[in-house]
């Protein structure tokens, strides 16, 4: 019943601003209305909070590490932690074989190079710790020398096949707090660590997990 009258011509840029304002004002109203809401908006899952972690393992010949954002404490008596890993990652195979892993909690001072080191190359073909100073926990696995605020050594107690991913349900065999810096969240990474792309005239792909940007028409076979 309410209406707004605009008595002068509206420029294109102003029209777009008005449309954007209208969309913003209506967004919450529509989402709460059962007859108007999009009830299959799976971007709602993006609102789940995630930390970012480096999971380290060893295949018997070399150390390996990968970035994950799916680490969850399940219980506290006994302590149980779940770690989900994509089956296509080499670390999934290694941890299935060995049954042990370390979870390194990245802190907010971790630079983008950490994500390049552990997220943009495969441990099948690259030694991710070559030339690095390393520390080892009681289980013999690496924990990072910097850019973490804590780490946990885990022993796999149960494996759950989730199709594309595997869930490792683990007991905690060792846990250390390194410092009091805040844990790196996925949101913090997106807003403060990930380089902002220059997209004009370029084609590429953006990883929905870590934000890595690959420029090109097709993805290489070794990028998951």
Description of each model-found segment:
Residues 1-35:
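FMN-binding flavodoxin-like domain, especially the glycine-rich phosphate-binding loop
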Residues 218-224:
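Short linker/helix segments within small regulatory modules
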Residues 207-210, 224:
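Short cysteine-rich clusters marking metal-coordination/redox-active sites
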Residues 4, 106-107, 218:
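Short loop/turn and capping residues at structural boundaries
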Residues 22, 203-206:
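Secretory pathway export signals and precursors
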Residues 31-203, 214:
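Basic, polyanion-binding surface patches
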